[in-house]
């Protein structure tokens, strides 16, 4: 066993864990040596690793916690246990952990790198490897029986890690440099005066205001003749068919369209005698308009269907 004076110091509150694989005599001897180091003001507490999560220690209770340090202990410390250790350690407190590791990944045991990573993820810093040594035959047998690993790449590693000098969730004000206020660009007085229009200038006799009625003369107000709007050569020549240009704006397209559309003016409805509209005195015996009042020529008159059948 290395000199404990390098692991704990006088006056500290120290916690030591053990499990079913730990030797009872070795545990008593180890605790006795620790008490000699931390005495008289220090204290050593002993915890079963399986009951640590149920012990409900207050935050920041211990200056140092030793995991797996009792002779004969073969234990893999879970992430939950390591997180609890980080909680009950005082700011700046130290964790010394010792457990078996494997050289290759994928085994039941962690690799040294994996163990260091788990400690950092638990909130600990300054992770330092103190030693790594091969197992003796008795320790190898314990790994096989207790952990179920029968590889030849097993060794024991001891690592020291520290809790940061602040509590988890604590806050501190950051002294950030003050932001410089942007300076406004300087304004040239001459340029400002050039673009400034005084209200009094609007009534100044020297200011000439254009009369909108004088902008157009009489020629501009005349309605142009349609022929003057035609483009050069538009629709000219009797030997060729008149055709409007694409996107015609001179009115030729509308003119040609009007020529194609037949007149829809209704013609006056003719009658056999031509006198039906004058009244019954001028209607023949078979006239369907008998009994109806006189109407204007071309006026639309609705006839009784019965009279149409009789006719």
From Swiss-Prot:
GO terms for cellular component: cytoplasm; mitochondrial intermembrane space; nucleus. It comes from the Eukaryota. GO terms for biological process: apoptotic process; hemopoiesis; iron-sulfur cluster assembly; negative regulation of apoptotic process. [4Fe-4S] cluster binds at residues 273, 276, 284, 287. Belongs to the anamorsin family. Component of the cytosolic iron-sulfur (Fe-S) protein assembly (CIA) machinery required for the maturation of extramitochondrial Fe-S proteins. Part of an electron transfer chain functioning in an early step of cytosolic Fe-S biogenesis, facilitating the de novo assembly of a [4Fe-4S] cluster on the scaffold complex NUBP1-NUBP2. Electrons are transferred to CIAPIN1 from NADPH via the FAD- and FMN-containing protein NDOR1. This is Anamorsin.
